Amino acid sequence: MKQHSPRFLSIVADSKKRIEEITPQILKEKMDSLEPLCLIDVREDNEWASGHIPGAIHLGKGIIERDIEKEVPDSQTLIIVYCSGGFRCALVADSLQNMGYSQVYSLTTGLQGWIDAGYNIKK
């Protein structure tokens, strides 16, 4: 498991105070019920290429603020963001809320939690 630096963990913890998180199980329920949502993978290009949650779109953490309004113009859209382990996506969720998106959730355990729960990924 990757060891994160104390300063990175500090800013993630700060972001997590302001955001809502969602578990893999609740995300799967929402997807199975066909609830309208936008699932966004915020990992790097090479991570996306190695596999992602079916139905997700890819907007890496480095470009999401620049491109989100083109991909998701309605700020009321239910958005769920994920990364590998739930850290980077917390930062992204906080940023999207600052941009006026009102229904943003971070996948608490990231893609690894999705896989650990036994759910499929698309390669």
Can you describe what each PLM-predicted range is?
Residues 1-38, 45-78, 84-123:
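Rhodanese-like catalytic fold shared by cysteine-dependent sulfurtransferases
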